[in-house]
Regions:
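Polybasic, glycine- and aromatic-enriched phosphate-binding surface used to engage nucleic acids
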Residues: 1-123, 127
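Non-catalytic DNA-recognition/assembly elements of restriction-modification systems
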Residues: 113-171
């Protein structure tokens, strides 16, 4: 619509192939990657997992890494009361008292390690996520936390340094 007018500017004349400018960097490959979308501020308790169809724009944070099923399990945990209570205690509240999903807060959240969750429980958690079943998610999260406690009681000290599960990329 305004391409001709923008092409007349100094920046466009200097590098004609980049006649446009954006505030945020654009990463075209990001659209195709599976990711979790976290709205900056929202009254909605549902967290969306994108299978690679959408590109996150302003006021949307995202977490990428792993397969779609892995991200659904993580999204379910992020929707749980266990994590929401942590977020409410960490963040400042905005716009009607809703917490913010900013990186400095998300990085402090205690989230169960997905790799030690029994497959049957993980499948149940994913099913609850797909059915928008918050009560089921909370029940699964409670069971996961009990299981995690038992695993760490049996193996109190990991023998090697554990690598992070995900790459947290925030826009």
């Amino acid at each position: 619509l305004h391409q001709e007018q923008l092409k007349g500017r100094h920046k466009a004349k200097k590098t004609p192939s980049r006649w446009y400018a954006t505030i945020d960097n654009i990463y075209p490959t990001l659209q195709k990657e599976p990711k979790i979308f976290l709205p900056d501020i929202s009254a909605n308790s549902y967290i969306f997992v994108d299978e690679g169809r959408y590109y996150p724009l302003h006021n949307i944070y995202y977490i990428k890494g792993g397969c779609v099923e892995f991200l659904k399990a993580l999204a379910a945990l992020l929707m749980s009361d266990f994590v929401r209570n942590q977020l409410n205690n960490l963040t400042n509240r905005m716009n009607g008292g809703y917490p913010r999903w900013q990186s400095q807060y998300v990085k402090k959240l205690r989230v169960p390690t997905l790799s030690i969750i029994p497959k049957q429980l993980l499948d149940k958690l994913i099913l609850c996520y797909e059915n928008f079943d918050i009560k089921g998610i909370n029940d699964c999260t409670s069971d996961i936390l009990k299981n995690e406690k038992m695993v760490y009681q049996e193996n109190p000290r990991p023998r090697k340094k554990v690598q992070p599960q995900l790459s947290f990329d925030f826009v």
